[in-house]
Amino acid sequence: MNRRAVVLGSAGQLGAELVRELRARGYSAIGWDRDEVDITDAAAVENAIARFDAEVVFNAAAYNQVDVAEEEPQAAFEVNALAVRNIALACRQTDARLVHFSTDYVFDGWARHPYAEDDPTHPLGAYAVSKLAGELYAQAYLDRVLIVRTSGLFGPRGLATARGNFVELMLRLAVSGQPIRVVEDHVASPTFAPLLAARTIDLADREAWGLFHIGGGAPISWFQFARTIFEVAGLKPMLLATSEREYRTRARRPKYSALSNAKMERVGLDPMPPVRQALEGYFAERSRAVSGTPA
């Protein structure tokens, strides 16, 4: 009998990859987005999960408008925290396992080494607070829960909902012909969505419960990441380095939020590849996704 899995937020970059990877591994996987299951409705969530008789639920749904969340924190909290409580309670009632995704933004960025899972959290804005609250709800209600923090997600599928994808933003700006300014004093671990999906399912299959970090390869500044994007894409726009002081945003963001994958590797998973290799994979997958060619 096939294992049965539900993916919430299946229209997004990560959700689309989870559905694809689960099915490739022989799971009977179904994906639901907000139009199909309202995760802020506790009864609707429990009924849907029970009806499908899911063994494992992957929650890739999130409110991720970091700056807008400063103006509407309740909306962020409803999706990133209260809805996670709904999902966790539904999993407890149906005896399903939960895999939930969180963010590097739970840290304040004062570290100068990749963050480990046991480093203290200190979220700086409404979005980050809501994501940390979601982690706490999941841990409070479930023993068999896997929480995966990631950073700077970029994925070729779900492009209709991926306007926040940094790679696509850079490509759009390159076409404009205008100078492109990117901060060089913020460092993260940009993460290729198909690899994140695969490593996460590996952890779930091993029943590696608890908190794990899965980020891209070596830490990289957003300016360096943009430069690598253009090199891999064969583009030569005018790219200029700027700083946080010159490029103000409504929400505060951690200046350093690179994630350590050491715990993931200790349980036997392969290291994440360098960012250039991940970008080469991105553009190859992107071409297939845009053309409709199967992977």
Whereabouts are the PLM-identified features?
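C-terminal amphipathic/interface module of NAD(P)-dependent oxidoreductases
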Residues: K255-A295
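NAD(P)-dependent short-chain dehydrogenase/reductase
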Residues: L136-A188, P194-L195, D202
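NAD(P)H-binding glycine-rich loop region in Rossmannoid oxidoreductase-like domains
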Residues: A42-V79, A90-R92
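Mid/C-terminal beta-alpha module of Rossmann-like enzyme folds, strongest
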Residues: R199, R206-R250, K255, F283-R286, ...
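Catalytic helix-loop patch of NAD(P)-dependent Rossmann-fold dehydrogenases
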Residues: E71, E78, L82-N86, V106-V148, ...
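N-terminal Rossmann NAD(P)H-binding glycine-rich loop of SDR-like oxidoreductase domains
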Residues: R3-L22
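Adenosine-cofactor binding site in Rossmann-like domains, unifying the SAM/SAH pocket
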Residues: R23-N47
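SDR active-site strand-loop-helix element
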Residues: L8, W32, A60-A61, L98-T103, ...
